[in-house]
Amino acid sequence: MKKPKKSFLFEKLGVSYTISAVIMTVTAITLTLVAASYAYQILEQQRGATEFDVAMESILAFNDALENIAWKHQASRSSRFTIEYGQLDLVPDRSLIVNVTGGPNASYSLSREFSTGYIVYSTRIKYTNFGEGYQSYFLGSKSTITSGAGSYGRASITQKLGEVYITLSYGVRAMKTSTFNVTQGNETVPVNSVDIWIIRISIPDSLRGTNIGDFDLKTKCLNLTTIPDCGPPGGNGYDLEGDKQCNITVQLEEDTSPPAVIQLDADKVVFNFVVATVQVSV
């Protein structure tokens, strides 16, 4: 009468061992899957972070290409981009306004508006995170105008609303380039010439929008235009009235920086807006 009870006990132990083995196997599989998933996420984050660093280098290379051809009519170049974890957008039709004023006694104040575009790479903060509100420049500076040598390009990193952006735009350069004489009545009057150089980015309608994958970002100088402003009728320039300087400010979308102050040494001044229209396309 006791033997069946012993057999039943062994059977219960056998079932218990089987259940334990199944539980251990399922647990091991689950842990393996979790570890694999975590490892994959880490790998994806590393790849996304690497792409961001490469995108910065590609933006710098593209800027070099663009500035190299900007003042050479019909010249063109390209730079290679590979984007999987973010996206590159070509943003057209943004306002660039140049304002020129003299000193308190000067007789001139002029403004010119141009349309331009810029290039934006964006990715999520899961791949790279600088902190909400972060902004810094790795090419140029926040200033929208310079009166000396240096890059026209302005490349910044900005983080907002869970995204990190690399933005490439182009500022303005201005300086006194020459002095010449004009005859006014019986007098010879010295006139300063101030050149204002502008790189205007043109983006074709068909290419506006988002780009992902492998592609060449191309740039081509479409034309060079000089727009002279020689002052009132007669074309001899604006009278300085003793104020030997001009102040030039540039508003590029929401960005406006303090004026570039150009020192002058003549009695009059003329301005030349020298515009390079550069097409950017994929």
Each model region followed by its residue ranges:
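N-terminal alpha-helical signal peptides/signal-anchor transmembrane segments
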Residues: 58-73
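Intrinsically disordered, low-complexity regions enriched in Pro/Ser/Thr/Gly and acidic residues
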Residues: 103-268, 279-282
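N-terminal beta-strand/beta-hairpin edge segment
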Residues: 86, 94-104
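Short, glycine/small-hydrophobic-rich surface segments
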Residues: 71-89
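N-terminal leader/signal peptides at the extreme start of proteins
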Residues: 1-13
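Aliphatic-rich helix starts adjacent to a transmembrane/signal segment
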Residues: 26, 30-59
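N-terminal signal-anchor/signal peptide hydrophobic helix marking the start
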Residues: 15-27
